[in-house]
């Protein structure tokens, strides 16, 4: 008997003897007939029988313990597919246009870019559509009041302004002729540190205007037209999973991709710019205040146009693999070359290769009433070493022997190799773009999949991570922290979670305006207290959107944020009703 099995055997034997003692106390007459006295067995045959029962139970217990991580990981792959996957590298690609007059070009979401990394070709896929700007950002300045121009109405209380000068590069091309809708900005910040300017834009913007170059004519926009895309559900870096809670992915990407908070969008920019009949305009961001030490730091590198994130994910057809009656599972290989650096992230589909062509198989957990009843099924599993294997469930057949050939469509990554790309990035799509693409920063390092042996407890935590459990928790603050930490990984420093000092949830009925009508609705008002001296607005924006994902159709959610040690509410978000989210 092996040492691990002996340990399980001793545990089961102790349990059996304890059960015998309880049996003797509850049923003394029957225990006496079996020669059981004070938990001791005098009949050697009965003793050997119970030893055999303990050994059988120990064997089963050992097998269950060894298979539990694989079973839990299989369940996670169905409910939270991205939880156990490798987080790929991300490159932030910037277009440097050629010529004096840039042209507008649309680079669709899912476009592929390639770059060389020490002789290996790495492939990246864009996560959003990029409409390149038909103008340049020629200057960025900041100044404090009194201003050298006439300020528009509604900005009287502002004490500082950030001005972005844009030019089409050709006097004959005017902004009134362009059809550029929203303006996407990437905040590179001061010396590649963007946290302070992000907090400034989110917390101090009073009003926005689009003006001519001399600031004589202003088209005023509301301050909330400038939004960070950190909580934009249409701006997700990782592939969306239909059966996965969207709030989990939102929080995860906040922790995994720090640069995501640097993307901003100015809504309705195009409509305002059309009213300026000039080839040069200014975007004026009127601020409540700007620290004096920031004034001289503003230059043409603080903001950038035409930046798009791209993840090191790409689809590839796997190597064909034969399957016969001697196999329980078959391996999945992305590339037959032994020196290949391609890593498999997900098996997307499986098909049988026949003389008549490819015959698709149905994923085991995606079967439905519309599925073909004659089709075969497949399910992929990954062991603790990261090797994917494929299990095939064939329809009933009378054949004792068979041989089939299967192919796979895979989602792959280049792993750590992608961090070494250097130089220009080339667009693989059939798109004519006048300019060069380069990565602003070196691509981020991939985050390896979880290797925690206590994964089953994390799985239980994910299943229990909902608004109801938070509402009825004895300590909602610690419960909320645990929920957020489940969205991160051990390798990632989620410092923002530790700033949460207190969370309280209050249920009440309140007036809310929906579709132009005032109604009374039940809802939940959440008060969050953060203990921080640093920026918090990007984090609170994400938490506000996170809580909204729990909002039912007939209730509302409102988040208020306080800073520990300060009086009053630092940020109160408007009430949002579940019916509004469903529109």
Task: Give the label of every model feature segment.
Residues 1, 55-64, 74, 78-83, ...:
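Short linear motifs embedded in intrinsically disordered, proline/glycine-rich low-complexity segments
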Residues 1-28, 34, 222-274, 282, ...:
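Mixed-charge (acidic/basic) macromolecular-recognition segments
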Residues 1-214:
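Extended assembly-interface regions of large multimeric machines
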Residues 45-53, 75, 201, 306-308, ...:
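Short, Φ-rich (hydrophobic/aromatic) sequence segments
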Residues 57-61, 81-82, 144-179, 298-303, ...:
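Extracellular ectodomain segments of secreted/surface proteins
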Residues 107-109, 122-128, 217-225, 420-425:
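Short amphipathic beta-strand/extended segments with alternating polar/hydrophobic composition
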Residues 171-368, 372:
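Short, low-complexity Pro/Thr/Gly
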Residues 354-583:
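C-terminal domain/tail detector
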């Amino acid at each position: 008997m092996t040492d691990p099995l002996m340990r399980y055997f001793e545990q089961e034997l102790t349990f059996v003897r304890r059960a015998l003692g309880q049996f003797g106390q509850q049923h003394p007459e029957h225990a006496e007939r079996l020669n059981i006295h004070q938990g001791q067995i005098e009949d050697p045959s009965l003793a050997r029988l119970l030893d055999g029962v303990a050994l059988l139970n120990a064997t089963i217990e050992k097998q269950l313990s060894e298979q539990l991580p694989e079973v839990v990981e299989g369940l996670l792959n169905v409910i939270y597919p991205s939880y156990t996957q490798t987080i790929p590298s991300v490159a932030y690609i910037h277009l440097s246009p050629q010529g004096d007059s840039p042209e507008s070009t649309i680079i669709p979401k899912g476009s592929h870019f390639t770059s060389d990394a020490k002789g290996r070709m790495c492939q990246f896929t864009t996560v959003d559509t990029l409409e390149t700007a038909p103008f340049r950002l020629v200057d960025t300045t900041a100044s404090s009041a009194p201003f050298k121009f006439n300020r528009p109405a509604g900005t009287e209380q502002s004490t500082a302004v950030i001005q972005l000068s844009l030019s089409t590069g050709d006097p004959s091309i005017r902004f009134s002729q362009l059809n550029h809708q929203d303006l996407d900005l990437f905040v590179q910040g001061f010396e590649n540190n963007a946290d302070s300017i992000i907090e400034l834009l989110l917390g101090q913007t009073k009003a926005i205007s689009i003006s001519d170059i001399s600031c004589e004519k202003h088209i005023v926009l509301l301050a909330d037209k400038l939004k960070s895309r950190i909580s934009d559900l249409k701006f997700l870096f990782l592939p969306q999973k239909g059966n996965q809670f969207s709030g989990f992915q939102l929080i995860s990407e906040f922790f995994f991709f720090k640069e995501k908070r640097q993307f901003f969008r100015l809504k309705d920019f195009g409509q305002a710019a059309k009213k300026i009949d000039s080839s040069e305009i200014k975007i004026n961001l009127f601020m409540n205040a700007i620290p004096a030490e920031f004034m001289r730091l503003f230059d043409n590198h603080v903001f950038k146009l035409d930046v798009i994130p791209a993840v090191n994910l790409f689809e590839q057809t796997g190597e064909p693999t034969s399957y016969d009656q001697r196999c329980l599972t078959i391996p999945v290989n992305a590339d037959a070359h032994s020196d290949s650096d391609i890593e498999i992230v997900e098996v997307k589909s499986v098909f049988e290769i026949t003389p008549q062509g490819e015959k698709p198989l149905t994923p085991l957990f995606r079967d439905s009433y519309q599925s073909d009843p004659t089709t075969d099924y497949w399910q992929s599993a990954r062991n603790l070493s990261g090797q994917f294997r494929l299990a095939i469930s064939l329809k009933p057949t009378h054949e004792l022997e068979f041989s089939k050939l299967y192919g796979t469509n895979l989602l792959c990554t280049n792993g750590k190799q992608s961090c070494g790309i250097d130089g220009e990035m080339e667009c693989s799509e059939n798109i004519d773009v006048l300019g060069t693409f380069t990565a602003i920063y070196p691509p981020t390092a991939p985050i390896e999949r979880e290797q925690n042996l206590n994964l089953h407890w994390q799985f239980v935590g994910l299943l229990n991570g909902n608004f109801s459990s938070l509402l009825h928790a004895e300590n909602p603050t610690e419960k909320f922290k645990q929920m957020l930490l489940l969205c991160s990984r051990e390798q990632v420093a989620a410092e923002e979670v530790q700033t949460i000092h207190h969370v309280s949830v209050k249920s009440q009925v309140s007036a809310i305006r929906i579709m132009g009508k005032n109604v009374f609705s039940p809802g939940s008002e959440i008060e969050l207290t953060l203990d921080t001296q640093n920026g918090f607005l990007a984090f609170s924006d994400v938490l506000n959107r996170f809580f909204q994902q729990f909002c039912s159709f007939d209730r509302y959610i409102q988040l208020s944020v306080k800073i520990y040690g300060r009086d009053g509410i630092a940020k109160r978000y408007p009430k949002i009703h579940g019916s509004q989210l469903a529109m």
